[in-house]
C-alpha cells in the first residue's frame, strides 16, 4: 500500500478540507479519468482496492495512473481506553481529496471498458465521482 517513506513529524492535525482542488483537475496522462465531486479523506487501503478493481476489469491491458497519494497520518487510540493521556498512535495513511481532483487516469483501452472499470473503482471509494475523458483534438 502507498505511504510516505519518511516524514518530518509522526503525527499531524486532523485539519479540514475547504474549497476546491487547486491543481490536478485535468487529465495529464491518460484518455479517461475519475474525478472527485466532494471533499473526503481517502485511505491507502481504499486507493489500493480501487486500483485492483480497475486493473482487473481492464484485464491487465492499458495503463493506470494514481493521481492522489496518502500523505496524512491518521491516529487512533486503542479500544476501551479512557479519554486523555495524549494522542493515539498512527494507524493508517490517508489522502485529502478536494472536489474537482482527478484521482485515477487510464489509457490503452476502449471507452466502454474504461467506463466500466472506473465505475467499479469508484464503488470502492468514499466520494461521489464523475467519469471524464479527453476531448478529441
From Swiss-Prot:
One of its GO terms (molecular function) is rRNA binding. Gene3D superfamilies: Ribosomal protein L10e/L16 (3.90.1170.10). Disulfide bonds: none annotated. GO terms for biological process: translation. Keywords: Ribonucleoprotein, Ribosomal protein, RNA-binding, rRNA-binding, tRNA-binding. One of its GO terms (cellular component) is cytosolic large ribosomal subunit. It comes from the Bacteria. CDD domains: Ribosomal_L16_L10e. Binds 23S rRNA and is also seen to make contacts with the A and possibly P site tRNAs. Part of the 50S ribosomal subunit. NCBIfam families: rplP_bact. Belongs to the universal ribosomal protein uL16 family. This is Large ribosomal subunit protein uL16. It comes from Methylobacterium sp. (strain 4-46). The lineage of its organism: Bacteria, Pseudomonadati, Pseudomonadota, Alphaproteobacteria, Hyphomicrobiales.
Amino acid at each position: 500500500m502507498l505511504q510516505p517513506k519518511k516524514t518530518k513529524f509522526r503525527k499531524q492535525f486532523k485539519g479540514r478540507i475547504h474549497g476546491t482542488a487547486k491543481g490536478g483537475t485535468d487529465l495529464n496522462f491518460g484518455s479517461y479519468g475519475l474525478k472527485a465531486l466532494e471533499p473526503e479523506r481517502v485511505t491507502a487501503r481504499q486507493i489500493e482496492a480501487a486500483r485492483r478493481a480497475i486493473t482487473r476489469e481492464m484485464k491487465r491491458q492499458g495503463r493506470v495512473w494514481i493521481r492522489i497519494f496518502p500523505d496524512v497520518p491518521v491516529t487512533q487510540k486503542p479500544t476501551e481506553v479512557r479519554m486523555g493521556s495524549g494522542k493515539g498512535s498512527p494507524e493508517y495513511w490517508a489522502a485529502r481529496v478536494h472536489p474537482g481532483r482527478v484521482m485515477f487516469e487510464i489509457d490503452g483501452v476502449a471507452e466502454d471498458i474504461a467506463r466500466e472499470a472506473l465505475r467499479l473503482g469508484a464503488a470502492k471509494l468514499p466520494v461521489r465521482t464523475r467519469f471524464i475523458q479527453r476531448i478529441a483534438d
